[in-house]
Structures are given as C-alpha cells and as structure tokens.
Amino acid sequence: MDFLIASKRHIKYANIISETIAFSAKARDTGIALRTPNYIKSKIENNNAIICLNKDEFVGFCYIEIWGHEKYVAHSGLIVSPKYRGLGLAKKIKEKTFIHSKKKYPNSKIFGITTGLQVMKINYTLGYK
C-alpha cells in the first residue's frame, strides 16, 4: 500500500472517491456529507489530501479543510474502499493526514469533524480531543 500526498496525477480517482463516499453513506444510512468529484479534485489539486493506493487501485482517501486564513485545519472525507476495510487503513490514512497537516500548516489548530463512531474512535486513539 502506498500512502501519498494527493497531487494532480491523482485527479483521475476523484470520481471513484466521490462514488465510494456516496455508497458508504447509503449503506450505513448515516448523515455522511456527499462530496462531488469537482470538490475532491480541488483538494487533490491543492495537495490537501492523502490518497492510499494499491498499485493503481484506489484504496482510501482523506482531505484537509482550511478555515480562518489557515488558523484552523480539519480532516474530513475519510473513506476506505469496502474491499480494504478492516485492515487498519483508515487509521493510517488519518495519521498521514495529520502529519501532512502539521508540515503544511504548522501554525494551525487541527481538529476532526465527524458523527461516525468508527472515526471518533480513530480520532481518540490518535489523540484528538
């Protein structure tokens, strides 16, 4: 598995990321916010996302949202392809997103916004308060 800072070469994955988020929201019957491919592309183009790939196959994704002139940074849109769930990859993606956020936005307060119990547990184990 490769955990990468998403860049323009990863734009081709925007549709599958958007579809995977939509599928997960429907399957779990939760209030997961849908993200359009164009929204995902904007995060990728600005290097504000982590993508996980198995060779060229999409595995997972998480993006960075910025507020208040970079005073605040949130991690959002965490998704893992159903084929790869249960392997601890969501936690690794969140860890990589946290590290990338600290390097890119060193003066920002970092937080996570979620209503999902699994993501809350990951955030807790990573030290989010």
PLM features: residue spans?
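A short beta-loop-alpha structural element at the N-terminal edge
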Residues: 1-17
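Conserved residues at beta->alpha junctions
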Residues: 5-8, 80, 114
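A conserved beta-strand-loop-helix scaffold within acyl/acetyltransferase catalytic domains
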Residues: 18-82
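Conserved acetyl-CoA-binding loop-helix of GNAT-fold acetyltransferases
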Residues: 80, 86-101
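Conserved GNAT acetyl-CoA-binding A-motif
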Residues: 101-115
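Extended, composition-driven regions rather than compact fold-specific motifs
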Residues: 118-121
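Conserved acetyl-CoA-binding loop of GNAT-fold acetyltransferases
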Residues: 124-129
